[in-house]
């Protein structure tokens, strides 16, 4: 978020479970498609916001399980916690706002009178959120009775039922919708109101997102009945809110294209990456394309062709260097030769590569320094290195004028590969 000096081109605010993340997609293909689209076209001028019912603990667990990007802003615990950036800096102003007419002690006291309510795990109990499980046929009556009792005791709370079993009690001012409204107001006060905002969800606790004025919305194809019913009753005449025909992250990509919010073709959907050209030199796009080619080569999804290797050598400066995360320095040309020998070595295996937080900085008239995290997943093994690449856009020997001059990598703490010899570029 701090890298933006002006209004974001697009702000995507997305739920995670069953929206951005498809738990029925073992290969995580729709998520990886979104990742490539975002990093290639949006990362340096837009904002990615994850809005989840998960607590910080469960959110961190999900990040370890799935190939997720790093968001600029994270809204957790059903809109009761807002944090910023890698350091997860909390928004103290939001926390203070939520204290109005909220008393957690009274909430726990009143809910303890209902044996039908089962407390969720301790990690899900937060300063401004008390969470339970409840059977679907009991939910509405309990919510009605609790609302009356809280009002009698001077509290102003909100009760949200979602997922057919989750019941969350929050301050009235909390929730995913209010958290989004707060963010938009804050960004506007800073002169950075996004040009467009797209809200994405699948369940009842996402409904509020679609109530914010001037916000585009997408209910993914697998949206739950509770959200569809809410939409039919409250937003069916809003042309900005659509019900996608694609599941999860694929539905988000579909919504970007449907509403003309920006590029909506993921580099992962391009069959021949060598023919994938941009009108102008876009460093982030080139980085994403390069590592996608690397993945496809090792998975044996493209043919073993000298044509591809020749093109790869052409974009690597003859005197260019690669500093391996282990500290060993090699020539880029030598790396291409080694790369050529590993064609199809991951065929039939779970092997994926994605890049995160691709941020280019122009350091000369035709030179760019691009920093990012490069992730590799091989079976159950996940490895990551912090990567810096020096690119030049002045190369008359190749069609798009691109030259890779220098690549430097260091292992991310706790994410080093046990077999460094198998780590390329």
Curated annotation (Swiss-Prot):
Top-rank EC class of the record's enzyme: hydrolase
Protein's UniProt name: Sucrose-phosphatase 2
Gene behind this protein: SPP2
EC number(s) on file: 3.1.3.24
Keywords, comma-separated and alphabetical: Hydrolase, Magnesium
Similarity-based family: Belongs to the sucrose phosphatase family.
Cofactors demanded by this protein: Mg(2+)
Description of the deletion phenotype: Plants show chlorosis, inhibition of photosynthesis, reduced growth rate and altered photosynthetic carbon partitioning in favor of starch.
Subunit structure comment from the entry: Homodimer.
Pathway as given in its UniProt record: Glycan biosynthesis; sucrose biosynthesis; sucrose from D-fructose 6-phosphate and UDP-alpha-D-glucose: step 2/2
Biological process terms in GO annotation: sucrose biosynthetic process
Organism: Nicotiana tabacum
Catalytic activity: sucrose 6(F)-phosphate + H2O = sucrose + phosphate
Annotated Pfam families: S6PP, S6PP_C
Annotated GO MF terms: magnesium ion binding; sucrose-phosphate phosphatase activity
Purpose: Catalyzes the final step of sucrose synthesis.
Notes on how activity is controlled: Inhibited by EDTA.
């Amino acid at each position: 978020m701090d890298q933006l000096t002006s209004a974001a081109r697009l702000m995507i605010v997305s739920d995670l479970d069953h929206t951005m993340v498809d738990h029925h997609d073992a290969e995580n293909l729709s998520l990886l498609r979104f990742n490539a689209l975002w990093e290639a076209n949006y990362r340096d001028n837009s904002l990615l916001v994850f809005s989840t019912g998960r607590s910080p603990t469960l959110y961190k667990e999900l990040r370890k399980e799935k190939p997720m990007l790093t968001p600029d802003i994270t809204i957790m615990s059903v809109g009761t916690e807002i944090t910023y950036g890698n350091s997860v800096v909390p928004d103290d102003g939001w926390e203070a706002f939520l204290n109005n007419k909220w008393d957690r002690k009274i909430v726990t006291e009143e809910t303890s009178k209902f044996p039908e309510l089962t407390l969720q795990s301790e990690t899900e109990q937060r300063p401004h959120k008390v969470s339970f499980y409840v059977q679907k046929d009991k939910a509405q009556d309990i919510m009605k009775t609790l609302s009356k009792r809280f009002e009698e005791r001077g509290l102003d709370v909100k009760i949200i039922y979602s997922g057919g079993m989750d019941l969350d009690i929050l301050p009235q001012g909390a929730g995913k919708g209010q958290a989004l409204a707060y963010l938009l107001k804050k960004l506007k006060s800073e002169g950075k109101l996004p040009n467009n905002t797209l809200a994405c969800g699948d369940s009842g606790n996402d409904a509020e997102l679609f109530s914010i004025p001037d916000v585009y919305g997408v209910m993914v194809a697998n949206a739950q009945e509770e959200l569809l019913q809410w939409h039919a009753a409250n937003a069916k005449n809003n042309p900005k809110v659509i019900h996608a025909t694609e599941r999860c992250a694929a539905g988000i990509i579909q919504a970007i294209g449907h509403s003309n919010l920006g590029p909506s073709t993921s580099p992962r959907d391009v069959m021949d990456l060598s023919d994938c050209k941009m009108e102008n030199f876009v460093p982030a796009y080139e980085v994403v394309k390069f590592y996608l080619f690397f993945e496809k080569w090792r998975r044996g999804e493209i043919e073993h062709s000298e044509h591809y290797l020749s093109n790869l050598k052409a974009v690597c400066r003859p005197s260019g260097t690669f500093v391996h995360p282990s500290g060993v320095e090699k020539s880029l040309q030598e790396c291409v030769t080694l790369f050529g020998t590993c064609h199809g070595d991951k065929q039939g295996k779970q092997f994926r590569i994605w890049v995160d937080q691709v941020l280019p900085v122009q350091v000369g008239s035709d030179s760019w320094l691009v920093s990012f995290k490069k992730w590799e997943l091989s079976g159950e093994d996940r490895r990551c290195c912090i990567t810096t690449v020096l690119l030049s856009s002045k190369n008359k020997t190749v069609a798009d004028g691109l030259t890779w001059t220098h690549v430097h990598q260091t292992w991310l703490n706790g994410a080093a590969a046990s077999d460094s010899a198998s780590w390329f570029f």
